[in-house]
Amino acid sequence: MPNISSSELIAQFQTALREGWGFIYGASGEIWTQAQQNAASREQTKKYGQKWVGHRVADCSGLFAWVFRQLGGYCYHGSNTMFRRYSSASGSLSAGKRTDGEPLKPGTAVYKFNASEGYHHVGLYIGEGAVIEAKGTAYGVVTSKIGSGWTHWGELKGVDYAEKACK
């Protein structure tokens, strides 16, 4: 797998944010069609998916899968597996900071974990306390704060984190 710079990763996530991507569970960068919306079976998609017709859509890990494809790499579509098998280094967060005292590097994946669902959500830390995430069907791709419930971090395999870290 080619090394992808963290700045390239961040730039692709910023593109999804700027273009107003939507969230559809299971998606990874395709344009959501009316036919897909009409056939939707998930309640959240039936309720909120109409506003994403004609937009690119992804779920949280699907956004990573799409970005890696654009940059010539590969990232598994599934946040649990991303954390467990595709992190070259990982650990816990407390109030948005690494518990080992090291700085969180821009381009690092951040996760939400609970005992019943495991690592059930993933976003990308972009620096200065901000995360870009595909948040949910009602929200689409948005920014959030690193201190807003993110519990773990993982530096992804195939990403060059040599650029300056942010405290």
Task: Name each model-derived stretch.
Residues 66, 70-90, 124-127:
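Short, basic/aromatic beta-hairpin or loop at an interaction surface
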Residues 88-98:
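Charged, often glycine-rich, active-site loop that binds/positions anionic groups
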Residues 148-167:
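Low-complexity, Gly/Ser/Thr/Pro-rich intrinsically disordered linker/tail segments
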Residues 1-74, 105, 118-121, 132-134, ...:
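N-terminal capping segments
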Residues 76-78, 122-147:
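Catalytic Cys-His active-site segments of thiol-dependent hydrolases/isopeptidases
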